[in-house]
Amino acid sequence: MKTDKSVFICEICGLKDQPKMPQVIGLDFGTTNSAIAVADAGKEATLAYFSNGSDTTSSFRSILYFPPKDRSSTVKAETKAGPEAINSYLDADSKGRLILSIKSYLGSRLFTSTQINGRYYTLEDLIAIILRRLRTTVIEQFGVSATTVVLGRPVRFAGADTKADETLALNRLRSAADLAGFSEVTFELEPVAAAYQYETQLDHDELVLIGDFGGGTSDFTLAQLGPGRKRTGRNPVVGTSGVAIAGDTFDSRIMMNLVAPKLGLGSHYVSLGKELPVPVWLYSQLSSWHRTFLLKDPKTMAVLREVKNQASEPGKVTALIQIISENLGYALYRAVESTKVELTENEDADFVFAHSSVNIEDTLERWRFESWIQEDIQNIATCVKTLISQHNVNYGDIGSVFLTGGSSFVPYVRRFFAKTFGSHKLKGGEELTTVAKGLALRALENA
């Protein structure tokens, strides 16, 4: 980014001042939540805020809502993003198209475009709507030009199995940013950005392990941080790693183990004289929130109706059909998410889903939930331990462990880090906005 070459005269002292550092932008486009921040020299990064009814929030839900097409009107219904998308969707009694976790598609070649209200949207088009809303807000609130941005990216994109997939994901994200009005884009790893923000809290130099737990991925960075690093401006990164396991994964475990059996998973139906299990893939789609709209495909609905007619427990399959046909997937998602959040503070939580004629209630104990995510935690642990061993770091040399992101609150996650590094080393704060602030601070070093 070019600095402002203008030199102004200080009105008080009458002396020439240094060229003014322009405000720079950091944008964290997340699977579940996004945020955007600005920073200038000598100041902390400042977050943009968004209206949410009578409240404001610095965390912008990465959600799109397309209202149903009104054939009697020539006026195109406005596409909603963030908090407005959720509120509009609920006000419309769940009619229309709600799109969640769209970041999860970046590394997948299976998604190229989708048709909504008679128009085809590419993945880049959809992501650009969210990024454009974030950009517009920061322009309105801070008066910046907002053509240059440091944009966060995970260490490993969800669904990206090869280097070619990673390249595809980055190219798509860059194209979406360009469509949103960002003509100059620099990428930074999200856990590295979190390190820049955590560094503002340090009054000494130390080796830090950063854990960024998003909706789609969990990413880790080893970094040398502190005042000494800031003075020299040297690259703080020792090493990075990541795994495609995070908040959405934990949600899916609740869906598959608690909810899906009440919608027919594990039951049977008769086809051509043979007793067969109800297809598991139906529930796998339902547990991946960003794929639920695929279940409304006419062929899938025909399969469901056939299964229901020959099912051993037709009432359960009927409930699944209602959830799909009445667009109740988001309400089900919120019920699952609410249960997971409640388990961060309590030993058990009541799962309640009561919409239309579908009524599901159960109590979930924390120990059961932890048994479902045990393998996920082990994979996260392996990722962290491999990162440390690859760089020949002694565990005792790590001064602190900074955990950010919504899933950093999950007790099982915290117990692993406390047991491995010591509870006194665990740090946190601003779990949903740390990365955006860090990206803005990183942008200062580019300015």
Residue ranges and their predicted role:
Residues 7-56, 86-210, 224-244, 360-391, ...:
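N-terminal phosphate-binding loop and flanking beta/alpha elements of the actin-like ATPase fold
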Residues 217-218, 296-306, 404-409:
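Core structural elements
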Residues 216-221, 436:
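Short glycine/serine/threonine-rich phosphate/pyrophosphate-binding segments
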Residues 255-260, 264-265, 419, 423, ...:
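Short, well-ordered loop/turn and helix-capping segments at boundaries between secondary-structure elements
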Residues 225-355:
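Phosphate-binding glycine-rich/basic clefts of nucleotide- and phosphate-handling proteins
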Residues 34-38, 62-65, 219-222:
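Short beta-strand scaffold segments in enzyme catalytic cores
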Residues 63-77, 249, 253, 257-262:
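P-loop NTPase motor core
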